[in-house]
Amino acid sequence: MSKTIAINAGSSSLKWQLYQMPEEEVLAQGIIERIGLKDSISTVKYDGKKEEQILDIHDHTEAVKILLNDLIHFGIIAAYDEITGVGHRVVAGGELFKESVVVNDKVLEHIEELSVLAPLHNPGAAAGIRAFRDILPDITSVCVFDTSFHTSMAKHTYLYPIPQKYYTDYKVRKYGAHGTSHKYVAQEAAKMLGRPLEELKLITAHIGNGVSITANYHGKSVDTSMGFTPLAGPMMGTRSGDIDPAIIPYLIEQDPELKDAADVVNMLNKKSGLSGVSGISSDMRDIEAGLQEDNPDAVLAYNIFIDRIKKCIGQYFAVLNGADALVFTAGMGENAPLMRQDVIGGLTWFGMDIDPEKNVFGYRGDISTPESKVKVLVISTDEELCIARDVERLKNTK
């Protein structure tokens, strides 16, 4: 038996989950937020308890020290050497990393170089990896890449219709993201349907603050909505999703607050989507509250959101030439029944129909009617478990 930590590090946060392996038992979980500020928050959940501390955490190394000390302080582990592996979620692995890998200096260097593809995510992941290697240098560290699952896409799918030199010289192509989530829920969907994954055609919709939709053919990703970066695809919480690229130079010319392309991309990443259109929030719960109040901006944001998701799902029905099931997962996918109802309401032509009583908050499983030709499933994603499994698989190959 061994203990493995799954880590999801952001620029100012560190989310973690401790597993007993190979039993896959969750021993504890938590998050450290606002790293770099004087009022950082560390939350630990274990044995039905919740401990929260306000601390001054300067960087990721200090955050890791606090996490490990808390594990001992709360009696979750007796000593550091009980931890035999740590797995790190990394958003962008480019073309280099087609599967999870054991970390070494070269791997870490490549992750930092690939920050250009995920500037909101890779730097934080690299900081988390460095922190664990500094404090626990003798345990196996594994990187699990969001992009790895999508390396099965065909060249005609991942290339953009621009001169090929931009791919050959600069590796401009579709990479996708959320691959660990899409892989996990596809496997769970096959179990739920009682059929081999290798026989299924699935559309998996990861709808959280970030949104990505994937066409899964016989267990492999054949297309996905996120692209060169996680900015592409349907409308998201704070991200615009797909827009006409000619808008970028136009806005630089017209708006004095947007001085260059970086300013526009920052606006598209952090100030757009549900938040930008509604002027209220990136949280669907707040948008739905606005719908109840007949707030016109909330209504508009919601309608754009539903429209873009329906179009993307419809597109992947064409890619797969039909589908056996549509899977909803992640924060909104799992917990926004109104959104699911309105998305499916625009896709009934494909043979989908949901049971209104099953499509309720908190329900997990098959929410379609017996007559529905395409099954509609709600499955809780578990990226952390996927990470822990890969650590267990790779820790003896160091």
Swiss-Prot record:
Cofactor binding note: Mg(2+). Can also accept Mn(2+).
Q: Does the keyword Amino-acid biosynthesis apply?
A: no
Does this UniProt record's set of keywords contain Metal-binding?
yes
Enzyme Commission designation: 2.7.2.1
Which residues are recorded as binding ATP? K15, H206, I207, G208, N209, G210, D283, M284, R285, G331, M332, G333, E334, N335
Active-site residue numbers: D146
Q: Which InterPro entries match?
A: Ac/propionate_kinase, Aliphatic_acid_kin_short-chain, Aliphatic_acid_kinase_CS, ATPase_NBD
Pinpoint the site Transition state stabilizer.
H178, R239
* Role of this protein: Catalyzes the formation of acetyl phosphate from acetate and ATP. Can also catalyze the reverse reaction.
On subunit structure and binding partners, the annotation says: Homodimer.
**What is the name attached to this protein's record?**
Acetate kinase
Look up and give the organism this protein is from. Answer: Streptococcus pyogenes serotype M6 (strain ATCC BAA-946 / MGAS10394)
